[in-house]
Amino acid sequence: MAPNNVDNPQNCVVNNTINGGVGVDDEETYGYAAQVLNSCVLPMVLNATIELGVLHLVNQAGSGPDGLSPAQLAALIQARNPDASVMLDRMLRVLATYDVVSCTAVPTEDGGFERRYGPAPVTKCFVPDEDGVSLAPMLNLVIDKVFLQSWSKLKEAVMEGGIPFNKVHGMHAFEYPAVDPRFNEIFNKAMYDQSTHIIKNILAKYKGFSQIQQLVDVGGGLGHTLRVITSKYPSIKGINFDLPHVVEHAPQIPGVEHVGGDMFESVPKGDAIFMKWILHDWSDDKCLTLLKNCYKALPENGMVIAVETNITDQPETTAYARAISQLDVSMMTQNPGGKERTRREFESLAKSAGFARVDFVCCASSFWVMEFHK
């Protein structure tokens, strides 16, 4: 009798072909294709476990057999659905296949086993840290219906031009929050959490703020980045510069002045100008206009401190390269001309705006700190 392959899904080859003619040699390829076509499942499941509080519980659990069973998790979140434990088990199994959580099979008295879930290294990225921030709000933003709807217009944008987000919503992504308070709150929370996390890592490595007296944060949102910077460097006078509808909601921060305006018209003067994830939002023409305004606002020997990703010239298969390539297409879909840039592209932009040189100083949380020197 032929061996039973049912219990091992990897042994699913029948008569040298599967699923309409994919050959044995293509088994791994087909499996990868199946993963790609269902890749939207991962962020949706992850977001649901975050909203349910399940990921937080898993992060607090022990590892291996000390992890939490689906039944325990269902009880802890007080789910009324009798099928909740089965649903959670299936959801967490997906996360375990991506190493978002860990999973251990523990034998049961009836000769079977139950899966118990605990934290993996990346789990902590999606639960609040000591500052109460995580990547969870950014995930919530990425899968929000406002952004998801834009993808339906990507093909049309390729064929006919235009920005997918604008085609759906009738305005660009930085105008939209002013007319949608719900989305504005989601956007601001995502920016706050990611900014707080990354700026702390930057301050641990980057020492370029030590001699600055007046620092302008262009596109600084509600001023949280300047709050963190000025907490470490209290001698700095901070100017938080953003659109009027943004700064009107900004809280009072000691040593920080909130200024509303249009960065494509002018930029407040300072010893240095800080821009985090601003250049990647805009086209080369818009960035050139902005950088020229920055150049005018700086004294001799002043500099722009820009925090951005550096995309590689050739595609790579590392997690970093995939993340940056995905972000690049997200910028293309959601933002007015947004893109991730190579080092050469940043150097070209800076020099076209009049800056003498670009220094790539350090990398923190996958983002490069660059100095554009006047």
Curated annotation (Swiss-Prot):
The active site is at residue 280. SUPFAM superfamilies: S-adenosyl-L-methionine-dependent methyltransferases (SSF53335), Winged helix' DNA-binding domain (SSF46785). Keywords: Alkaloid metabolism, Methyltransferase, S-adenosyl-L-methionine, Transferase. One of its GO terms (molecular function) is O-methyltransferase activity. It is an enzyme of class 2 (transferase). GO terms for biological process: methylation. Pfam families: Dimerisation, Methyltransf_2. It comes from the Eukaryota. S-adenosyl-L-methionine binds at residue 242. Pathway: Aromatic compound metabolism; Alkaloid biosynthesis. S-adenosyl-L-homocysteine binds at residues 195, 219, 242, 262, 276. The keyword DNA damage does not apply. Its EC number is 2.1.1.-. It catalyses: dopamine + S-adenosyl-L-methionine = 4-methoxytyramine + S-adenosyl-L-homocysteine + H(+). InterPro entries: COMT-like (IPR016461), O_MeTrfase_dom (IPR001077), Plant_O-MeTrfase_dimerisation (IPR012967), SAM-dependent_MTases_sf (IPR029063), WH-like_DNA-bd_sf (IPR036388), WH_DNA-bd_sf (IPR036390). Expressed mainly in vasculature and cortex tissues at low levels. The keyword S-adenosyl-L-methionine applies. Homodimer. O-methyltransferase participating in the biosynthesis of natural products derived from phenylethylamine, including mescaline, a natural hallucinogen potentially used in psychotherapeutic treatments. Catalyzes the O-methylation of dopamine to produce 4-methoxytyramine. Belongs to the class I-like SAM-binding methyltransferase superfamily. Cation-independent O-methyltransferase family. This is O-methyltransferase 16. It comes from Lophophora williamsii. The lineage of its organism: Eukaryota, Viridiplantae, Streptophyta, Embryophyta, Tracheophyta. The gene is OMT16.
